């Protein structure tokens, strides 16, 4: 909407309806996939806009989700009922192509998918079909399935997603601010220092390695 209004205004069209239709966020349903610290932070901020919050995360207890003012649901319910679907999942065998052809066919035609997690959690071909056949309305991607930075050379034409007007793509930079860069570096340095001192790091993803070291 903002892009359409801006483009029209720059071309000499002064009309408040150039960005229409616009629908308010309040009262809409936001579904969040994966409810770790980032997912919880998203929920906390989204609540201020008056959205209904649903969460799918089989590794988080229902009571923990409910304490955050969210409704725990299964995958199908989340996909069917979400107006905004936030993908914040890590990349695992279980989450690979979490959204693919079957899932997009279940979604609302006005749904918007936003992926600020890992690119391969969404099937690129299925997403393209969903966007071009009006199965969903739009998508925001901070990381497509194949990240261009992982290729020695790339051309936007290699991925048809980049050609669509109803897709917003950022270069894996949705987290970025000068402050966040500083905090990320400080956090990494702090965890390395803990390991050197023989302490347990704060966020181990493979704690079994720590157990072997202790033995």
Describe the residue ranges of each PLM region.
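Rossmann-like dinucleotide-binding domain for NAD(H)/NADP(H)
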Residues: 101, 110, 116-215
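Rossmann-like dinucleotide/phosphate-binding beta-alpha-beta segment
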Residues: 17-109
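A residue-identity detector for tryptophan
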Residues: 14-16, 154
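Hydrophobic residues in well-ordered beta-strands that form the structural core
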Residues: 55, 74, 87, 115, ...
């Amino acid at each position: 909407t903002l892009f359409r209004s801006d483009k029209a205004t720059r071309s000499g069209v002064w009309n408040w309806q150039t960005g229409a239709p616009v629908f308010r966020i309040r009262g809409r349903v936001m579904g969040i996939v994966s409810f770790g610290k980032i997912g919880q932070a998203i929920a906390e901020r989204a609540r201020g806009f008056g959205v209904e919050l649903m969460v799918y995360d089989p590794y988080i207890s229902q009571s923990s989700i409910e304490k955050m003012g969210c409704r725990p649901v299964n995958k199908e319910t989340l996909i069917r009922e979400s107006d905004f679907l936030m993908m914040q999942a890590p990349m695992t065998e279980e989450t690979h192509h979490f959204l693919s052809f079957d899932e997009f066919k279940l979604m609302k035609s006005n749904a918007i998918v936003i992926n600020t997690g890992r690119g391969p959690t969404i099937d690129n071909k299925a997403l393209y079909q969903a966007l071009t056949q009006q199965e969903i309305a739009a998508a925001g991607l901070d990381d497509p399935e194949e990240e261009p930075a992982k290729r020695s050379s790339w051309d936007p034409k290699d991925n048809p997603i980049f050609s669509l007007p109803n897709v917003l793509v950022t270069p894996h930079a949705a987290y970025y601010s000068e402050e966040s860069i500083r905090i990320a570096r400080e956090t990494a340095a702090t965890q390395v220092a803990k390991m050197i001192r023989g302490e347990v790091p704060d966020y181990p993803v493979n704690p079994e390695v720590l157990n072997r070291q202790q033995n």
